[in-house]
Design a protein with these regions (language model features):
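Transmembrane beta-barrel domains of Gram-negative outer membranes and organellar outer membranes
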Residues: 26-172, 176-277
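Bacterial N-terminal signal peptides that target proteins for export
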Residues: 1-12
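N-terminal signal peptide c-region/cleavage motif recognized by signal peptidases
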Residues: 21-23
Length: 277
Protein backbone atom coordinates (compact mmCIF):
# COMPACT_ATOMS: atom_id res chain seq x y z
CA UNK A 1 0.00 0.00 0.00
CA UNK A 2 2.90 2.38 0.77
CA UNK A 3 4.39 1.87 -2.70
CA UNK A 4 1.00 2.53 -4.27
CA UNK A 5 0.60 5.82 -2.35
CA UNK A 6 4.12 6.89 -3.37
CA UNK A 7 3.39 6.15 -7.04
CA UNK A 8 0.18 8.18 -6.99
CA UNK A 9 1.88 11.08 -5.16
CA UNK A 10 4.70 11.22 -7.72
CA UNK A 11 2.18 11.28 -10.56
CA UNK A 12 0.13 14.09 -9.00
CA UNK A 13 3.25 16.17 -8.36
CA UNK A 14 4.32 15.66 -11.98
CA UNK A 15 0.90 16.75 -13.24
CA UNK A 16 0.94 19.86 -11.08
CA UNK A 17 4.42 20.92 -12.19
CA UNK A 18 3.59 20.56 -15.88
CA UNK A 19 0.23 22.28 -15.47
CA UNK A 20 1.72 25.35 -13.78
CA UNK A 21 4.34 25.69 -16.51
CA UNK A 22 1.75 26.04 -19.31
CA UNK A 23 -0.11 29.21 -20.20
CA UNK A 24 -3.23 29.39 -22.35
CA UNK A 25 -4.45 26.22 -24.04
CA UNK A 26 -5.66 26.87 -27.60
CA UNK A 27 -8.51 25.14 -29.41
CA UNK A 28 -5.89 23.10 -31.28
CA UNK A 29 -4.75 21.57 -27.97
CA UNK A 30 -8.31 20.50 -27.15
CA UNK A 31 -8.52 18.86 -30.56
CA UNK A 32 -5.14 17.24 -29.93
CA UNK A 33 -6.53 15.78 -26.70
CA UNK A 34 -9.37 14.18 -28.67
CA UNK A 35 -6.89 12.97 -31.30
CA UNK A 36 -4.75 11.30 -28.63
CA UNK A 37 -7.82 9.34 -27.52
CA UNK A 38 -8.35 7.84 -31.00
CA UNK A 39 -6.26 4.64 -31.50
CA UNK A 40 -6.58 4.86 -35.32
CA UNK A 41 -5.86 8.57 -35.75
CA UNK A 42 -3.63 9.20 -38.78
CA UNK A 43 -0.80 10.62 -36.66
CA UNK A 44 2.67 9.49 -35.64
CA UNK A 45 2.74 9.03 -31.88
CA UNK A 46 4.93 7.45 -29.26
CA UNK A 47 3.20 6.37 -26.02
CA UNK A 48 4.91 5.05 -22.90
CA UNK A 49 2.39 3.20 -20.73
CA UNK A 50 3.44 2.01 -17.27
CA UNK A 51 1.17 -0.49 -15.49
CA UNK A 52 1.79 -1.60 -11.90
CA UNK A 53 -0.02 -4.54 -10.27
CA UNK A 54 0.21 -4.61 -6.49
CA UNK A 55 0.52 -7.56 -4.06
CA UNK A 56 1.33 -10.14 -6.74
CA UNK A 57 2.37 -13.69 -5.88
CA UNK A 58 2.95 -15.44 -2.56
CA UNK A 59 5.28 -12.70 -1.29
CA UNK A 60 2.99 -9.79 -2.14
CA UNK A 61 5.44 -7.97 -4.40
CA UNK A 62 4.67 -5.53 -7.22
CA UNK A 63 4.65 -6.45 -10.89
CA UNK A 64 5.49 -3.65 -13.33
CA UNK A 65 4.88 -3.63 -17.10
CA UNK A 66 6.24 -0.73 -19.15
CA UNK A 67 4.72 -0.83 -22.64
CA UNK A 68 6.64 1.10 -25.28
CA UNK A 69 4.15 1.36 -28.13
CA UNK A 70 4.99 3.48 -31.20
CA UNK A 71 2.21 4.03 -33.74
CA UNK A 72 3.15 4.51 -37.40
CA UNK A 73 0.35 5.38 -39.87
CA UNK A 74 0.61 5.05 -43.65
CA UNK A 75 -1.74 6.41 -46.28
CA UNK A 76 -3.19 3.87 -48.73
CA UNK A 77 -4.69 6.54 -50.95
CA UNK A 78 -7.65 8.83 -50.45
CA UNK A 79 -9.93 6.22 -48.85
CA UNK A 80 -7.91 4.22 -46.31
CA UNK A 81 -5.00 4.39 -43.88
CA UNK A 82 -2.95 1.55 -42.43
CA UNK A 83 -2.30 2.15 -38.73
CA UNK A 84 0.67 0.12 -37.45
CA UNK A 85 1.04 -0.27 -33.69
CA UNK A 86 3.93 -2.05 -31.97
CA UNK A 87 3.89 -2.89 -28.25
CA UNK A 88 7.25 -3.69 -26.64
CA UNK A 89 6.74 -4.77 -23.00
CA UNK A 90 9.48 -4.42 -20.40
CA UNK A 91 8.40 -6.49 -17.40
CA UNK A 92 9.53 -6.58 -13.78
CA UNK A 93 8.16 -9.90 -12.54
CA UNK A 94 8.13 -11.11 -8.91
CA UNK A 95 9.34 -14.66 -8.36
CA UNK A 96 6.83 -17.31 -7.29
CA UNK A 97 9.43 -19.16 -5.21
CA UNK A 98 11.64 -16.41 -3.73
CA UNK A 99 11.11 -12.92 -2.35
CA UNK A 100 12.85 -11.34 -5.35
CA UNK A 101 11.95 -9.83 -8.73
CA UNK A 102 13.61 -9.88 -12.14
CA UNK A 103 13.28 -7.72 -15.25
CA UNK A 104 13.11 -8.76 -18.90
CA UNK A 105 11.28 -8.20 -22.17
CA UNK A 106 7.98 -9.82 -23.05
CA UNK A 107 6.52 -10.95 -26.36
CA UNK A 108 6.17 -8.06 -28.82
CA UNK A 109 2.73 -7.40 -30.31
CA UNK A 110 2.24 -5.92 -33.78
CA UNK A 111 -1.18 -4.76 -34.96
CA UNK A 112 -2.10 -3.45 -38.43
CA UNK A 113 -5.50 -1.73 -38.62
CA UNK A 114 -7.11 -0.79 -41.91
CA UNK A 115 -9.13 2.35 -41.21
CA UNK A 116 -11.07 4.87 -43.36
CA UNK A 117 -9.12 8.05 -44.14
CA UNK A 118 -12.20 10.20 -43.52
CA UNK A 119 -13.78 9.90 -40.09
CA UNK A 120 -17.52 9.32 -39.77
CA UNK A 121 -19.69 9.21 -36.66
CA UNK A 122 -18.49 5.63 -36.14
CA UNK A 123 -14.71 5.37 -36.47
CA UNK A 124 -13.31 1.88 -37.01
CA UNK A 125 -10.20 -0.12 -37.73
CA UNK A 126 -9.79 -3.82 -38.44
CA UNK A 127 -6.82 -6.09 -39.08
CA UNK A 128 -4.52 -8.79 -37.71
CA UNK A 129 -2.56 -8.78 -34.48
CA UNK A 130 0.68 -10.78 -34.33
CA UNK A 131 2.57 -11.95 -31.26
CA UNK A 132 6.31 -12.27 -31.85
CA UNK A 133 8.25 -14.77 -29.66
CA UNK A 134 10.63 -12.26 -28.09
CA UNK A 135 10.15 -13.01 -24.37
CA UNK A 136 13.53 -13.15 -22.66
CA UNK A 137 12.31 -15.90 -20.30
CA UNK A 138 9.23 -18.01 -19.51
CA UNK A 139 8.29 -15.66 -16.67
CA UNK A 140 7.85 -12.79 -19.16
CA UNK A 141 5.69 -14.45 -21.82
CA UNK A 142 4.90 -17.64 -23.71
CA UNK A 143 7.75 -17.17 -26.20
CA UNK A 144 5.47 -18.46 -28.96
CA UNK A 145 4.29 -17.01 -32.25
CA UNK A 146 0.64 -16.03 -32.19
CA UNK A 147 -1.97 -14.45 -34.41
CA UNK A 148 -5.56 -13.28 -34.21
CA UNK A 149 -8.10 -10.63 -35.21
CA UNK A 150 -8.16 -7.08 -33.87
CA UNK A 151 -10.92 -4.45 -34.06
CA UNK A 152 -11.15 -0.80 -33.01
CA UNK A 153 -14.53 0.93 -32.66
CA UNK A 154 -15.10 4.45 -31.32
CA UNK A 155 -17.18 7.58 -31.61
CA UNK A 156 -16.60 11.26 -30.81
CA UNK A 157 -19.62 13.30 -29.72
CA UNK A 158 -18.90 16.86 -28.60
CA UNK A 159 -16.54 16.50 -25.61
CA UNK A 160 -16.97 12.72 -25.36
CA UNK A 161 -14.70 10.07 -26.89
CA UNK A 162 -15.69 6.44 -26.28
CA UNK A 163 -14.84 3.10 -27.80
CA UNK A 164 -12.86 -0.11 -27.47
CA UNK A 165 -9.85 -2.01 -28.78
CA UNK A 166 -10.56 -5.76 -28.99
CA UNK A 167 -8.36 -8.69 -29.96
CA UNK A 168 -7.91 -12.42 -29.42
CA UNK A 169 -4.55 -14.14 -29.88
CA UNK A 170 -3.86 -17.85 -30.24
CA UNK A 171 -0.25 -19.03 -30.08
CA UNK A 172 1.36 -22.07 -31.69
CA UNK A 173 3.71 -24.24 -29.64
CA UNK A 174 3.84 -26.35 -26.50
CA UNK A 175 1.77 -23.86 -24.50
CA UNK A 176 -0.72 -22.98 -27.29
CA UNK A 177 -2.26 -20.09 -25.37
CA UNK A 178 -5.62 -18.54 -26.27
CA UNK A 179 -6.22 -15.09 -24.77
CA UNK A 180 -8.84 -12.37 -25.19
CA UNK A 181 -8.26 -8.64 -24.64
CA UNK A 182 -10.59 -5.64 -24.56
CA UNK A 183 -9.47 -2.13 -23.67
CA UNK A 184 -12.66 -0.07 -23.52
CA UNK A 185 -12.31 3.65 -22.94
CA UNK A 186 -14.49 6.63 -22.07
CA UNK A 187 -13.03 10.14 -22.12
CA UNK A 188 -14.66 13.46 -21.23
CA UNK A 189 -12.69 16.52 -22.28
CA UNK A 190 -12.61 19.48 -19.88
CA UNK A 191 -11.46 23.11 -20.28
CA UNK A 192 -7.74 23.89 -20.58
CA UNK A 193 -7.02 20.47 -22.17
CA UNK A 194 -7.74 18.43 -19.04
CA UNK A 195 -9.79 15.27 -19.45
CA UNK A 196 -11.37 12.51 -17.39
CA UNK A 197 -10.57 8.98 -18.51
CA UNK A 198 -11.62 5.43 -17.75
CA UNK A 199 -9.72 2.86 -19.82
CA UNK A 200 -9.43 -0.49 -18.01
CA UNK A 201 -7.95 -3.51 -19.76
CA UNK A 202 -10.13 -6.62 -19.41
CA UNK A 203 -8.50 -9.96 -20.25
CA UNK A 204 -9.54 -13.60 -20.41
CA UNK A 205 -7.40 -16.74 -20.57
CA UNK A 206 -9.70 -19.21 -22.32
CA UNK A 207 -7.59 -22.22 -21.27
CA UNK A 208 -7.66 -21.45 -17.56
CA UNK A 209 -10.12 -22.92 -15.07
CA UNK A 210 -13.53 -21.23 -15.09
CA UNK A 211 -12.88 -19.30 -11.86
CA UNK A 212 -9.41 -18.23 -13.06
CA UNK A 213 -10.25 -17.01 -16.59
CA UNK A 214 -11.04 -13.33 -16.15
CA UNK A 215 -9.28 -10.18 -15.00
CA UNK A 216 -11.84 -7.35 -14.81
CA UNK A 217 -10.58 -4.04 -13.40
CA UNK A 218 -12.77 -0.99 -12.86
CA UNK A 219 -11.66 2.60 -12.32
CA UNK A 220 -10.28 5.66 -14.04
CA UNK A 221 -8.37 8.88 -13.62
CA UNK A 222 -7.39 12.19 -15.14
CA UNK A 223 -5.28 13.39 -18.05
CA UNK A 224 -3.94 16.60 -19.56
CA UNK A 225 -2.42 17.69 -22.87
CA UNK A 226 0.43 20.20 -22.92
CA UNK A 227 2.89 21.38 -25.55
CA UNK A 228 6.57 20.82 -24.84
CA UNK A 229 8.47 23.92 -25.89
CA UNK A 230 5.23 25.18 -27.38
CA UNK A 231 5.58 22.67 -30.22
CA UNK A 232 5.41 18.96 -29.31
CA UNK A 233 2.02 17.88 -27.92
CA UNK A 234 2.21 15.55 -24.93
CA UNK A 235 -0.77 13.81 -23.34
CA UNK A 236 -0.28 12.66 -19.74
CA UNK A 237 -2.65 10.54 -17.71
CA UNK A 238 -2.88 8.67 -14.43
CA UNK A 239 -5.47 6.02 -13.56
CA UNK A 240 -6.25 3.74 -10.62
CA UNK A 241 -8.17 0.46 -10.97
CA UNK A 242 -9.76 -2.02 -8.58
CA UNK A 243 -9.80 -5.64 -9.77
CA UNK A 244 -13.45 -6.65 -9.43
CA UNK A 245 -12.72 -10.13 -10.82
CA UNK A 246 -9.22 -11.62 -10.81
CA UNK A 247 -7.35 -14.93 -10.90
CA UNK A 248 -5.47 -16.20 -7.86
CA UNK A 249 -2.09 -14.58 -7.27
CA UNK A 250 -3.09 -11.04 -8.25
CA UNK A 251 -3.79 -8.25 -5.78
CA UNK A 252 -6.81 -5.97 -5.68
CA UNK A 253 -5.28 -2.82 -7.14
CA UNK A 254 -3.40 -1.59 -10.19
CA UNK A 255 -2.25 1.82 -11.42
CA UNK A 256 -1.38 3.18 -14.85
CA UNK A 257 0.72 6.22 -15.77
CA UNK A 258 1.06 7.17 -19.43
CA UNK A 259 3.02 9.68 -21.51
CA UNK A 260 1.84 10.06 -25.10
CA UNK A 261 4.08 12.07 -27.45
CA UNK A 262 2.34 13.22 -30.64
CA UNK A 263 3.79 14.32 -33.98
CA UNK A 264 0.94 15.65 -36.16
CA UNK A 265 1.36 16.24 -39.88
CA UNK A 266 0.85 19.68 -41.44
CA UNK A 267 -2.61 18.75 -42.75
CA UNK A 268 -3.64 17.44 -39.34
CA UNK A 269 -2.50 20.67 -37.64
CA UNK A 270 -4.75 22.60 -40.02
CA UNK A 271 -7.70 20.34 -39.15
CA UNK A 272 -7.10 20.80 -35.42
CA UNK A 273 -6.91 24.57 -35.71
CA UNK A 274 -10.28 24.46 -37.45
CA UNK A 275 -11.78 22.15 -34.82
CA UNK A 276 -12.39 19.36 -37.35
CA UNK A 277 -10.94 16.38 -35.43
Amino acid sequence: MTNKIKSISIALTFFAAISLSTNGIAQSTLEMAKASQNPVMNMYNFPFQNNTNYDVGPFGRNQNVLNIQPVLPFSLGSKFNLINRIIIPVITQPSSTEDISSTGTGDILYTAWLSPAKANKLIWGVGPVLQLPTASGPEYGSGEFGIGPSVVLLTMINKWVAGAVINNIRTFGDLSTNKFFINYFVNYNLPKAWYLVSAPIVTANWKAESDQKWLVPFGGGVGKVVKLGGKIPLSMQAQVFYNVVKPDGLGDWQTRFQLYFMFPTKSMKEKMQGGKI
